[in-house]
């Protein structure tokens, strides 16, 4: 059975332990675990999960604060008042195409709206045409900015809630 919900502290740990295990040898994932757990604890972000039979299989995080490292102070991406950033959308390969991330994003958008956010931004590498197409289909169709990140061109779009 699939569940789509806010990540509890235990589920948040399980998600990050899974991510770290899938990226053995890449120490950055351990740093991100600490960072995102801290963001969830202090209200700078909220992580949501897709679970299957109690195990995490997908995730996404809403970043509210411009101080989150992925936002890097760019107020057009997240400003802590009316604009949040949708970050780190992931789903296990075996569940891709099943609509699970779409369902999770709808829950995340409602969560943001209920807390006064009226705009959500999302970014994708320019070469990820499939993801860009999906985001446009979801209504993220107002171009916000672009920048180079880790050697890739990332395009950011916004959706008004």
Question: Where are each of the predicted segments found?
Answer:
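Active-site beta-strand termini and strand-to-loop segments that position acidic
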Residues: 51-53, 158-161
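Short hydrophobic/aromatic beta-strand or adjacent loop that forms the aromatic wall/cage
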Residues: 45, 152-156
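Conserved beta-strand-loop-alpha-helix junction that forms the acyl-donor binding cleft
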Residues: 122-132, 148-153
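Active-site acidic-Proline motif in GNAT/NAT acetyltransferases
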Residues: 92-94, 98, 127
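Extreme N-terminal starter segment of soluble prokaryotic enzymes
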Residues: 1-2
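Conserved GNAT acetyl-CoA-binding A-motif
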Residues: 112-124
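Acetyl-CoA-dependent GNAT
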Residues: 6-10, 17-88, 92-94, 105-107, ...
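Conserved active-site tyrosine of GNAT-family acetyltransferases
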Residues: 135, 140
């Amino acid at each position: 059975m699939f569940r789509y919900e806010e990540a509890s502290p235990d589920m948040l740990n399980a998600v990050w332990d899974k991510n770290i295990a899938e990226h053995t040898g890449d120490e950055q994932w351990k740093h991100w675990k600490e960072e995102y757990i801290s963001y969830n604890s202090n209200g700078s972000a909220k992580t949501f999960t897709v679970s299957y039979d109690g195990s995490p299989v997908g995730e996404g995080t809403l970043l509210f604060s411009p101080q989150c490292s992925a936002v890097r102070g760019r107020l057009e991406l997240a400003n802590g008042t009316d604009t949040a950033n949708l970050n780190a959308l992931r789903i296990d390969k075996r569940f891709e195409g099943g609509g699970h991330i779409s369902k999770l994003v709808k829950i995340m958008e409602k969560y943001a709206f209920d807390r006064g956010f009226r705009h959500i931004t999302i970014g994708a590498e320019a070469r990820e045409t499939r993801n860009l197409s999906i985001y446009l289909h979801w209504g993220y169709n107002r171009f916000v900015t672009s920048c180079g990140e880790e050697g890739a061109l990332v395009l950011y779009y916004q959706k008004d809630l």
